[in-house]
Curated annotation (Swiss-Prot):
Compartments, record wording: Secreted; Target cell membrane
Secreted listed as a keyword: yes
The entry's keywords: Amidation, Amphibian defense peptide, Antibiotic, Antimicrobial, Immunity, Innate immunity, Membrane, Secreted, Target cell membrane, Target membrane
Name recorded for this polypeptide: Alyteserin-1d
Length: 23
């Protein structure tokens, strides 16, 4: 549902931020 899409998007965003911080 919509919550799943939101969770997936949020998880992707967190991963991207974590990748930038790691670099």
């Amino acid at each position: 549902g919509l919550k799943d899409i939101f969770k997936a998007g949020l998880g992707s965003l967190v991963k991207n931020i974590a990748a930038h911080v790691a670099n």
